[in-house]
Regions:
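Surface-exposed, charge/polar-rich loops and edge strands
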Residues: 1-157
Length: 157
């Protein structure tokens, strides 16, 4: 079971994200999980009227027909109606191949250990290209984990 990551996102950031019209660059896998969880928080508000934590398997439970804009609008309206300036919830979301990315376009991250859930996220994000990238990193003695080398990854279409 994925651990819960609490997060807080400001109303100002949500409004910029909603109306930005530009690529979203996440720094780190926790940022990816946070940003992608926003969609499911918005869906929860649309369908149940409240902002709740995102369950580990929520993205895979069924098809979701709401647009990202509808989801973000729901969060923004929810916060404004309550006079709140930030969203505070948590996520247990796991991102594996087959995940539909709705928010993040580019990821800056370090290299993750083989057979980790974070490598599953990388595989979901860039598709089959993860393997040659990691083979290159291993062959050239790149450092892994928190103080290791980093990579700039673009989402597979």
């Amino acid at each position: 079971k994925m651990h819960r990551e609490p997060f807080s996102v400001s109303l100002d950031f949500l409004m910029k994200l909603r109306h930005g019209g530009h690529q979203v660059i996440a720094v780190g896998t926790t940022s990816v999980r946070t940003l992608e969880s926003l969609y499911y928080v918005g869906v929860g508000i649309i369908e149940e009227g409240e902002a709740k934590d995102v369950d580990q398997w929520a993205p895979y439970a069924r098809e979701y027909d709401y647009s990202l804009e509808e989801s973000l609008d729901a969060i923004i309206d929810y916060l404004k109606a309550r006079g709140e300036t930030s969203l505070r919830v948590g996520t247990r979301i796991i991102i594996v191949p087959g995940f539909r990315f709705r928010v993040v376009d580019v990821l800056v991250t370090n290299f993750h250990q083989p057979q980790s859930t974070l490598l599953l996220l990388i595989s979901a994000f860039i598709g089959g290209e993860w393997k040659p990238i990691y083979e290159y990193a291993l062959a050239h003695s790149f450092r892994f984990l928190s103080y290791g080398d980093s990579s700039l990854l673009f989402r597979a279409e």
